[in-house]
């Protein structure tokens, strides 16, 4: 009740932060005169001066005003652009590890240079993260002259880059790349066979462009490096022939089942579910074609894989539509990013779904894959010591940024006030009426020489709009995943008078639409343009620019609402950049996906009450509120899915960190002889305890079993029973010592046959191999556990607690297996004398061959095809995210282990250090 009054008296938190930063802005401005007086060499020398001051103990915060002044002056000299005061505030926001929300056209790329320059002075590296390779190259090459003028190096990481080139890019002061490439390189580094093969340094500071797209939209898609598994293409083809015979069961409408069938489709949760009739029908068909034995059930343990194939086929046919979720090009299924409309070449859906789509489209079916390494963007980006980001739309997701990443959102004031007019939504009864109204609006704008941008949610809609406009004889350009090669050219001219552009999800395109067109692109298209030609192009552009402004600026038309208000705001933001005039209007119908699934009943009843006729539209605040409520509902559900993904992946992430730490320690070690000796002792102790239980009577001892186990695990035949018969004083402990002594003799003989150096190298490579193979199998087991764990909710058990408990047990078994299998291999193998460098080179070559067979996948997020369950079946509590700026404290050996086992650290995960 007092909140509005307090806000009025003291201002909002955002306003108070802006006021605080304005004081620092004044200090930066005070340095400007001093910087202007410096020569280029003196200004460049400031970088080395700052580095020296940091070495003496000065902090980046203390350097900030002067460093920002240097970056601003360098921007003026090199690029002809001076940072505005509000851009300085944006730079401070990024440096403090926050998210800067800045409107389209406010110069986010230039803002980033301030925080990037300051943090690069530490020498620990800065990663600039973009949503695609084009923007990474464009921004790096655009800002490279500025950074190099200041004495800093710039690198770009791209897919399929030569290793040395990529290593050099990561070693640079500033590195540009995509979120996917950084994430996959992190996974690749943790599959390397040598420290020299790794790419990334310590993850120090990241500035994420379009941060909402990367940390929110893509958080549901785990990153997976996979290798090929067994070929089951024939099975997919057979299943694909059966799926069309299944009929969809239409749920009750006004008390009646309109169409009984075999399965239901839930569009809200994007799930398909076979009913009882469906299970019986599919079992009969599978039996007929010989895929299921007579009398067998699909739910038998050995048939669950077949059931997975059936569900993959159902999802491929009913949830994945051509030209919406994917396109077919060059005989391949290319996934379409639902948020940007771009294709994602090389990315494949996991769990057999991609193969099912290939079978549906009668394409060549590629082999299934097995996970070799995986992570999520949520957990990858939380590895950075400091994280920040910038976008035009973050405030609607401020709660999630804080909950998951502990990142605050700072709304940066615009340099010029917004002049765009946002009209109320127009809602029609049918899609046909809606499209007719859009065409009418387009004609009116073109008659006034206004440029128009039509935003669509799918490729299908963009092509439908294009066909309607062709019928009307209206000239236009189409920008979607099919024609993305022409993207830059289309965007450059989208602001010309009377230009009409249809775009699938403009979000993340990274290019501003300039009123009057882009004169710089026109100049770039000329070969050796003369000063006179450039002057003429500028003059022509100025006339067009003024003409468009007088006509009312860019008009944005949206053909439907997106699930996220943020994507809608991004589309609106294409008009009215930097104080330009402009307008936006959303056209909707009750047949739109969002309206049909979430908002149609309430709006339809309202429209009926008004007695609306065909062709009429409703424009009312109540309708807009109902739509926004529907969007908030979808956003809330998507947040729950992302939160659940994080909660489950946090369990795997702790295990991942332990394994990767173990691996890195192993790679860095010159000699792991002591580690192998510890493994041998532990494996032997466990083996003896299994056959000779502690404090047991000799009558309870299984000596024959122990002899057989020693032969299996250690490749030695020891007469244990004979020793016991010959020596009555031999007890459990002394027997243990005698066996260990014999094992050491056998192992030392192996060392004599080769050499100490060769055996040490071999131990390291064997442990790496065993660790990688078992970790790969563990990931597969964890996947199976996670995908079935939600069923525990029906047994009144908490799925998350069950997952944590069982995954901990699996991890304990993994650690034991690593030790046991390593010792078993080392005991059985015959080591010949081989140059360690040759052995390492051979292993590296094998690793490169493996890498060439790897696939990089986006898995369907857990939760999309499974219900969100906790112990009550309700909403789960939000996982509290760890701090993005952190200083890890080392756990004491006698403290309780972090994993929750209740054991001391030295007796649990401390054993592997």
Curated annotation (Swiss-Prot):
Gene Ontology CC terms: cell envelope Sec protein transport complex; cytosol; plasma membrane
GO BP terms: intracellular protein transmembrane transport; protein import; protein targeting; protein transport by the Sec complex
Cellular compartments annotated: Cell inner membrane; Cytoplasm
SMART domains: SecA_DEAD, SecA_PP_bind
UniProt superkingdom: Bacteria
Positions bound to Zn(2+): 897, 899, 908-909
Membrane topology classification: Peripheral membrane protein
UniProt: ATP binding residues: 87, 105-109, 512
Keywords, ordered alphabetically: ATP-binding, Cell inner membrane, Cell membrane, Cytoplasm, Membrane, Metal-binding, Nucleotide-binding, Protein transport, Translocase, Translocation, Transport, Zinc
Textual note on the cofactor: May bind 1 zinc ion per subunit.
Enzyme Commission no: 7.4.2.8
Reported cofactor(s): Zn(2+)
Gene Ontology MF terms: ATP binding; metal ion binding; protein-exporting ATPase activity
Catalytic activity: ATP + H2O + cellular proteinSide 1 = ADP + phosphate + cellular proteinSide 2
Role noted for this protein: Part of the Sec protein translocase complex. Interacts with the SecYEG preprotein conducting channel. Has a central role in coupling the hydrolysis of ATP to the transfer of proteins into and across the cell membrane, serving both as a receptor for the preprotein-SecB complex and as an ATP-driven molecular motor driving the stepwise translocation of polypeptide chains across the membrane.
Family: Belongs to the SecA family.
Assembly and binders: Monomer and homodimer. Part of the essential Sec protein translocation apparatus which comprises SecA, SecYEG and auxiliary proteins SecDF-YajC and YidC.
Protein's recorded name: Protein translocase subunit SecA
Lineage: Bacteria, Pseudomonadati, Pseudomonadota, Gammaproteobacteria, Pseudomonadales
Name of the gene encoding the protein in the UniProt record: secA
């Amino acid at each position: 009740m007092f909140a509005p009054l307090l806000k009025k008296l003291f201002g909002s938190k955002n306003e108070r932060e802006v006021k605080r930063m304005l004081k620092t802005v004044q200090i930066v401005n005070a340095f400007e005169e001093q910087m202007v007086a410096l020569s280029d060499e003196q200004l460049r020398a400031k970088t080395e001066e700052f580095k020296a001051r940091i070495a003496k103990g000065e902090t980046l915060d203390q350097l900030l005003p002067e460093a920002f002044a240097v970056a601003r002056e360098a921007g003026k000299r090199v690029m002809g652009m001076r940072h505005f005061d509000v851009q300085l505030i944006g730079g401070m926001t990024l440096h403090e590890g926050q998210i800067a929300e800045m409107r389209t056209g406010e110069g986010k790329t230039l803002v980033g240079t301030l925080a990037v320059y300051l943090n690069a002075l530490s020498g620990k590296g800065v990663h600039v993260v973009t949503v695609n390779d084009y923007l990474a190259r464009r921004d790096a090459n655009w800002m490279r002259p500025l950074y190099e003028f200041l004495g800093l190096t710039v690198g770009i990481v791209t897919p399929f880059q030569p290793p040395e080139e990529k290593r050099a890019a990561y070693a640079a002061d500033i590195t540009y790349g995509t979120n996917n490439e950084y994430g996959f390189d992190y996974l690749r580094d943790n599959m390397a066979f040598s420290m020299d093969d790794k790419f990334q340094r310590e993850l120090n500071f990241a500035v994420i462009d379009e941060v909402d797209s990367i940390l929110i939209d893509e958080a549901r898609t785990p990153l997976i490096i996979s290798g090929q598994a067994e070929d089951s293409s024939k099975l997919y083809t057979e299943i694909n022939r059966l799926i069309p015979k299944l009929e969809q069961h239409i749920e009750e409408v006004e008390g009646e089942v309109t169409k009984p069938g075999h399965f239901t489709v839930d569009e809200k949760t994007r799930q398909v579910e076979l009913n009882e009739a469906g299970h019986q029908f599919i079992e009969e068909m599978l039996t007929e074609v010989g895929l299921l034995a007579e009398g067998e059930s699909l739910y038998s343990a050995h048939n669950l894989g077949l059931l997975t194939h059936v569900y993959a086929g159902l999802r491929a046919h009913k949830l994945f539509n051509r030209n919406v979720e994917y396109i077919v090009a060059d005989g391949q299924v290319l996934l379409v990013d639902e948020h940007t409309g771009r294709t994602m070449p090389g990315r494949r859906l996991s769990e057999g779904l991609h193969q099912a789509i290939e079978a549906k489209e009668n394409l060549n079916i590629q082999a299934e894959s097995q996970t070799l390494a995986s992570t999520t963007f949520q957990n990858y980006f939380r590895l950075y010591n400091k994280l920040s980001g910038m976008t035009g739309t973050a405030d609607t997701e401020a709660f999630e940024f804080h909950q998951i990443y502990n990142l605050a959102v700072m709304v940066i004031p615009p340099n010029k006030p917004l002049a765009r007019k946002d009209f109320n939504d127009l809602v029609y009864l049918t899609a046909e009426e809606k499209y007719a109204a859009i065409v009418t609006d387009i004609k009116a704008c073109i008659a006034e020489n206004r440029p128009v941008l039509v935003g669509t949610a799918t490729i299908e809609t963009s092509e439908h709009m294009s066909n309607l406009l062709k019928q009307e004889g209206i000239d236009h350009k189409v920008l979607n995943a099919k024609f993305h090669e022409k993207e830059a050219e289309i965007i450059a001219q989208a602001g010309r008078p009377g230009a009409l552009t249809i775009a699938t999800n403009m979000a993340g395109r990274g290019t501003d639409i300039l009123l009057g067109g882009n004169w710089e692109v026109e100049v770039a298209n000329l070969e050796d343009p003369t000063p006179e030609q450039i002057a003429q192009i500028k003059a022509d552009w100025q006339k067009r620019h003024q003409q468009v402004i007088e006509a009312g600026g860019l008009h944005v038309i949206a053909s439907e609402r997106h699930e996220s208000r943020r994507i809608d705001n991004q589309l609106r933001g294409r008009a009215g950049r930097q104080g330009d005039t402009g307008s936006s209007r959303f056209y909707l119908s009750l047949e739109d996906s969002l309206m049909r699934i979430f908002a149609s009943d309430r709006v339809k009843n309202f429209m009926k009450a008004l007695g609306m006729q065909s062709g009429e539209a409703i424009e009312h605040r109540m309708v807009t509120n109902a739509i926004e409520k529907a969007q908030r509902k979808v956003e809330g559900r998507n947040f729950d899915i992302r939160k659940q993904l994080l909660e489950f992946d946090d369990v795997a992430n702790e295990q991942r960190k332990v394994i990767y730490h173990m691996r890195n320690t192993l790679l860095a070690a010159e000699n792991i002889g002591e580690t192998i000796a510890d493994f041998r002792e532990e494996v032997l102790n466990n083996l003896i305890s299994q056959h000779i239980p502690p404090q047991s009577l000799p009558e309870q001892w299984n000596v024959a079993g122990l002899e057989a186990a020693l032969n299996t695990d250690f490749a030695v035949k020891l007469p244990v029973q004979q020793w016991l018969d010959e020596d009555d004083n031999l007890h459990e402990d002394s027997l243990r010592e005698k066996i260990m002594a014999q094992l050491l003799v056998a192992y030392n003989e192996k060392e004599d046959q080769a050499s100490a150096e060769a055996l040490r190298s071999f131990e390291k490579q064997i442990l790496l191999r065993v660790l990688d193979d078992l970790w790969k199998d563990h990931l597969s087991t964890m996947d199976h556990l996670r995908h079935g764990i939600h069923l525990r909710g029906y047994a009144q058990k908490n799925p998350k607690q069950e997952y944590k408990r069982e995954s901990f047990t699996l991890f304990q078994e993994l650690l034991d297996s690593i030790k046991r299998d390593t010792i078993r291999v080392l005991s059985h193998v015959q080591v010949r004398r081989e140059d360690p460098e040759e052995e390492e080179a051979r292993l590296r070559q094998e690793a490169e061959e493996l890498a060439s067979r790897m696939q990089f996948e986006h898995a369907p997020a857990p939760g999309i095809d499974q219900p969100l369950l906790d112990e009550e079946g309700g909403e789960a509590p939000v996982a509290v995210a760890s701090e993005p700026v952190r200083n890890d404290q080392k756990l004491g050996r006698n403290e309780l282990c972090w994993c929750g086992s209740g054991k001391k650290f030295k007796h649990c995960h401390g054993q592997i250090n």
